[in-house]
Amino acid sequence: LLHVGLQQILLMDRVPASAAVSTAVELAKRERLQRLAPVVNGVLRAAVRAVEAGESLPVPSDPQKRLALEHSLPDWLVAELWGQIGPERTEALAAASNRIPPLDLRCNRLRSSREALLENLPAVALEELPDGLTLTSRAGPLPQLAGFSEGQWCVQDRAAQRIAPLLDPQPGQRVLDACAAPGGKTTHIAELMGDQGEVVAVDVAPRRLQQVSANAERLGLRCIRTEAADATDLTEWEAESFDRVLLDVPCSGLGTLARHADARWNLKPDGIEELVGLQHQLLEQGARLLKPDGRLVYATCTVHPAENTGVVEAFVEENPDWQFSEPPLQLWPDPQGGDGFFAAVLSRRR
């Protein structure tokens, strides 16, 4: 309650200080904290007096600790990023992590066109993406917007829309999406293939695959087949049996903190190291399943080098018959919209 009250008093201009104090006190009484209500009242009124007197909160002199405090990030995470990507990138990421992300859509080119959607939706085109648009206003629940029930579009961040095209999937091919749920990239792959061929969507959680199937059904995509399996152990699957492999691996999610406000507090210093081990396993398994002339995309929604270039460069070094097909893609969280993503395209040397 004190945190909420101080947030309103210090940072929210539209909430009168008196209302912030009285609301917090009333909530304390309702939540069986009646004996502490005078404490809440006293602390918040003292804060109001300090603000009116022109006083400000003490700010740490250390730039890393100040950044962590100002943007509500764990101290260890700021220190880690500061050392890995530098102060400027860390400051930009911290600022972007507290913005309200825009709501981006991807046009289902098999059922509509971006031009047609723009005529019926409060949206503008994302010029850098052939099928992307972003809503300019939210009027009611998404399922009530034009074209939703007809499967003409789905929700997908503009950065995520950059991943599936890197596979360059072709009609008639067999494609593996090894960490598929909830299915945004799975359905994008199927659309790019003209719904011709087979997209095998794998996830370790059967319930999450139900969401993949539901999305595919709404979008009218028939080439998607779901299979519950642990993608770190696909040794029983036939080697070199897929034309394309997408590995959108589990990661720290540092590129999507704006969408998951609590994620920053769930991360642990040793968690990234554990994730890197998992990512290595997934890459080894996915590579084994790719045909000799195929194309593999390793992707994350993080900006941590250990999970990105660290994983793929180690793989290429350990497997000399593999190479980068093109320079890796690093997208940084953008305050104007767009999550942080990384993608590397790998193939066997000919």
What are these model-predicted stretches?
Residues L1-R350:
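S-adenosylmethionine
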